[in-house]
Amino acid sequence: MKALVYKGPEQLAFQDVLDPTLNGEEKLIKIDSVGICGSDMHAFLGHDERRPAPLILGHEVSGTIVAGAQQGHRVTVNPLVACGQCLACISGRDNLCPDRKIISMPPKEGGFAQYISMAMENLTVVPDDFSLEKACMAEPIACGWHAVRLAKAALGAQGEGIRALVIGGGAIGVGAALSLIAQGIQSVMVTEPNKKRRDFLRVGNGFSVIAPEELAD
């Protein structure tokens, strides 16, 4: 298959690589869309020792299962591969699994390729009326969604009268702001130091955007 391979700081190569090997009940997925995470950029610039070259980056993935009983199912990928046996996993908190791995870090290659292999428990079927281009954003959106859900539980509130401040208007910050609104928080503010980003975010997102220095006012 073809893949975009990280070869070293600021070096990528589009080249032939071996097709994924299916282990056990893993599914082969033909990739449709992959997001570019901030961690991919850190790796590309050589700032992430956890991602040594050569390596296929990319973990925000959606695509279509191409073999087996689920062939044709459109899916989005949970990139976190947990052991399934430790206390965290059996408690439903596999994100805290001490043996967790993630695609785009050795030994798991990432999604900037034509195909990837994943276990069915790491796949969520995408509705027919939802684009795979949008579905690849499920993983970054889930970060903010999970944080909002935990915060609401800690406050013991449904959203009425709560005001929320999100520090940073990058991808995860915007996802958190949108998750706050979707979960019933009506007063949401985002602080962002970059003026161009502030101007962009002020258009039709349902939350207010200010510069950090304006908080003192």
Regions found by a protein language model. Name each.
Residues 39-45:
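Cytochrome P450 core scaffold surrounding the K-helix E-X-X-R motif
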Residues 131-214:
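Mid-domain Rossmann-like dinucleotide-binding core that forms the NAD(H)/NADP(H) cofactor-binding site
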Residues 83-164:
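NAD(P)H dinucleotide-binding glycine-rich loop of Rossmann-like/cofactor-binding domains
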Residues 60, 73-74, 88, 94, ...:
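Residue-level marker of beta-strand positions
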Residues 8-10, 23:
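Residue-level recognition of beta-strand termini and adjacent short loop/turns
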Residues 18-34, 47-87, 127-129:
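Glycine-rich beta-strand-centered segment in the early N-terminal region that forms part
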Residues 1, 73, 161-162:
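Nucleotide donor/acceptor-binding cores
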